[in-house]
């Protein structure tokens, strides 16, 4: 199992740290990215493309305000998205 965290911005780091600490506790591998669905949609799509060959994967999105990131990731990936 692998978790890919995508934050809307680096300002979301403190919240992401809480999540990655728990993933570490459970022995789940993870990677973390900062990419805005509004300002960097191509970067988000690149992250999704780079992980499309994974077998067991979940996306965890962290974004404030409109939270377009969760919907954008869910709409462009076959893997579950938690946002």
Question: What does each model-found stretch correspond to?
Answer:
Residues 47-83:
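Glycine-rich phosphate-binding loop
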Residues 12-17, 41, 66-72:
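Short glycine/serine/threonine-rich phosphate/pyrophosphate-binding segments
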Residues 28-54:
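N-terminal beta-loop-helix "entrance" segment that forms/cooperates
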Residues 1-37:
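Glycine-rich phosphate/diphosphate-binding loop of Rossmann-like nucleotide-binding domains
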